[in-house]
């Protein structure tokens, strides 16, 4: 993918959740909620502070992150759906 986010924005690809319950019931797409986890695909250079210096982002490409249900702007690139969001919209990095 060739896209470079600007400033403190990141590109996130949603992680697909299991579409089947523990008892084996398949959940249709219309009833399934969109996942609130994703993988960072690209990061911007950082946010410019009041002193004029650029503060690098804390997240990096490959990080698995947790974000709010309505975070980011959905975009399609070459048929794939991604989210463009600010670093501050990310609630945490999933480790391990």
UniProtKB/Swiss-Prot annotation:
Question: Is Chaperone given among the entry's keywords?
Answer: yes
For biological process, the GO terms are:
chaperone cofactor-dependent protein refolding
SMART domains per record: Cpn10
Q: What is the role of the protein in this entry?
A: Together with the chaperonin GroEL, plays an essential role in assisting protein folding. The GroEL-GroES system forms a nano-cage that allows encapsulation of the non-native substrate proteins and provides a physical environment optimized to promote and accelerate protein folding. GroES binds to the apical surface of the GroEL ring, thereby capping the opening of the GroEL channel.
Q: Name one Pfam family in it.
A: Cpn10
Q: Which UniProt keywords apply?
A: Chaperone, Cytoplasm
Q: What is the lineage of its organism?
A: Bacteria, Pseudomonadati, Pseudomonadota, Betaproteobacteria, Nitrosomonadales
What family does the database annotate?
Answer: Belongs to the GroES chaperonin family.
A single GO molecular function term of this UniProt record? metal ion binding
Species annotation? Nitrosomonas europaea (strain ATCC 19718 / CIP 103999 / KCTC 2705 / NBRC 14298)
Compartments, record wording? Cytoplasm
PANTHER family found in the cross-reference section: 10 KDA HEAT SHOCK PROTEIN (PTHR10772), CO-CHAPERONIN GROES (PTHR10772:SF58)
Q: Which GO CC annotations does the UniProt entry carry? A: cytoplasm
Tell me yes or no: is Cytoplasm among this UniProt entry's keywords.
yes
By what name is this protein known? Co-chaperonin GroES
Under InterPro entries, the record lists:
Chaperonin_GroES (IPR020818), Chaperonin_GroES_sf (IPR037124), Chaprnonin_Cpn10_CS (IPR018369), GroES-like_sf (IPR011032)
UniProt subunit comment: Heptamer of 7 subunits arranged in a ring. Interacts with the chaperonin GroEL.
Domain of life of the native organism: Bacteria
């Amino acid at each position: 993918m060739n896209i470079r986010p600007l400033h403190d924005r990141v590109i996130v690809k949603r992680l697909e959740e299991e579409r089947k319950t523990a008892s084996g019931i398949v959940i249709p797409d219309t009833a399934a909620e969109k996942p609130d986890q994703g993988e960072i695909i690209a990061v911007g250079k950082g946010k410019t502070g009041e002193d004029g210096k650029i503060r690098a982002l804390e997240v990096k490409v490959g990080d698995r992150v947790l974000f709010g249900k309505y975070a980011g702007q959905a975009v399609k690139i070459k048929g794939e759906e991604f989210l463009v969001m600010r670093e501050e919209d990310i609630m945490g990095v999933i480790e391990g």
